[in-house]
């Protein structure tokens, strides 16, 4: 069984490298479609987390008398990461079913679609971290050198969300959720 698993993993890695241009095109298409009819375009990736943080900050700070220092920064970091996880898993869930016409026409490994959704959401999350930096500057939060290590948990979250999206997409095809 371990040999079968290894061959399967090698084949998946080979397909991933082979279809990398397709993943790039799917991510590019997804980002263009997401902001196509928007007046502000990609600025929404920064503006949306800021507006959510502002609203939640007002509600939790003033209505509930919450006096946590740098509370808006905690809110925007948590919201950005949760939004990434939520969108990656929910879009990964339906990605294979939505691309069924393409899958029926030509051979494409089905795992390409949830992975492209995860990469697309990761790029959007990286744009959203511009809003996090703005909040850090605005709230005068202390910058530590450990901020340069923040990429590691982001990569781990990406792989976890991508794996969960792959699992959910397989279940969605099987159970037609």
Label every PLM stretch briefly:
Residues 1-176:
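Hydrophobic transmembrane alpha-helices and immediately adjacent juxtamembrane helices
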């Amino acid at each position: 069984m371990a040999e079968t698993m290894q061959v399967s993993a090698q084949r998946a890695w080979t397909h991933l490298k082979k279809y990398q241009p397709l993943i790039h095109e799917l991510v590019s298409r997804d980002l263009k479609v997401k902001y196509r009819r928007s007046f502000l375009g990609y600025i929404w990736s920064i503006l949306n987390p800021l507006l959510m943080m502002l609203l939640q900050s007002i509600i939790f700070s003033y209505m509930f008398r919450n006096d946590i220092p740098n509370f808006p920064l905690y809110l925007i970091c948590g919201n950005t990461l949760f939004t990434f996880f939520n969108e990656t898993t929910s879009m990964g869930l339906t990605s294979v079913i939505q691309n069924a016409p393409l899958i029926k026409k030509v051979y494409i490994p089905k795992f390409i679609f949830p992975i492209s959704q995860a990469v697309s959401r990761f790029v959007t999350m990286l744009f959203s971290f511009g809003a996090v930096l703005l909040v850090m500057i605005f709230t005068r939060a202390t910058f530590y050198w450990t901020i340069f290590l923040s990429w590691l948990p982001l990569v781990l979250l990406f792989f976890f969300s991508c794996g969960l999206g792959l699992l959910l997409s397989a279940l969605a095809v099987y159970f037609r959720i």
